[in-house]
Amino acid sequence: MSKNKDQRTAKTLERTWDTLNHLLFISSCLYKLNLKSVAQITLSILAMIISTSLIIAAIIFIASANHRVTSTTTIIQDATNQIKNTTPTYLTQNPQLGISPSNPSEITSLITTILDPTTPGVKLTLQSTTVRIKNTTTTQAQPNKSTTKQRQNKPPSKPNNDFHFEVFNFVPCSICSNNPTCWAICKRIPNKKPGKRTTTKPTKKPTLKTTKKDPKPQTTKSEEVPTTKLTEEPTINTTKTNIITTPLTSNTARNPELTSQMETFHSTSSEGNPSPSQVSITSEYPPQPSSPPNTPR
């Protein structure tokens, strides 16, 4: 009955609140118009009354809300008192829990486990309950623990018959019967057993960084060999001539041609030393004057 009364009062308060708001709006609009002084005074009085009634309605509304809160707290307290006053009988009757009826003071708390079937894992929630035995109450609050089992994602199992569905990019030799061109093109298929395929990854060779150095030209200084220049000595050309000795007679003095022939036979050496025959000849006869050389003009 108390709940119904609270609901009715709340509805009436809401209705009065709305009507008072509308009246305030209408009175403010009328006050803005140029009316007589008496009408303006009455409108202002109405506005004051409406505003005070709104304040009163708000106070009542807040009080009713507080009353609702207190009523819910009293209901909760009544429920807890009923739980405290009534002791559970199945605790003393269940031998699996290890509790005998002779010592009921050992009963302190009841832990219930609730399994949630909607979640993939299992959630264990520990709830604390209070039990009153011989005017003694003990409470144990334990945090709620949630444990979830992680699903192991298994890889999809591959069928073992993959070997039978291989697509060949070449002509197998089993097809060729007596065709020579087919035997020239075909390739023999090795006998493979279905199993694990081993894939060999190409190993990358380490790149060796080589720095090329410019070869410097090796300059070898050629040792100068001291060369000794041989002083050329003048070669003396000695021409041996058959000297025909002719007796100097009186005819030689008479004939000057004979004297010239004699001078040619007795030739001098390269050093210009006259022969003794020439000296003797020239000594006997005076030298003839030689003709002067032809000088160009």
Curated annotation (Swiss-Prot):
Q: Where is this region: Binding to host heparan sulfate?
A: 187-198
Task: For the region Disordered, give the residue spans.
Answer: 133-161, 191-297
The membrane spanning regions, by residue number, are 38-66
Q: Which GO terms describe its cellular component?
A: extracellular region; host cell plasma membrane; membrane; virion membrane
Membrane topology (Cytoplasmic)? 1-37
Q: State where composition is biased (Low complexity).
A: 233-249
* Residue ranges with Polar residues bias: 133-155, 250-282
Disulphide-bridged cysteine pairs:
C173-C186, C176-C182
Against InterPro entries, the record matches this protein to: G_prot
Attached carbohydrates are found at 70, 72, 80, 86-87, 92, 100, 105, 113, 119, 135, 137-139, 144, 147, 199, 203, 219, 231, 235, 237, 251, 269-270, 275, 282-283, 290
Q: Which parts of the chain does the record assign to the membrane side Extracellular?
A: 67-297
Protein name according to UniProt: Major surface glycoprotein G
Task: Look up and give the organism this protein is from.
Answer: Human respiratory syncytial virus A (strain rsb642)
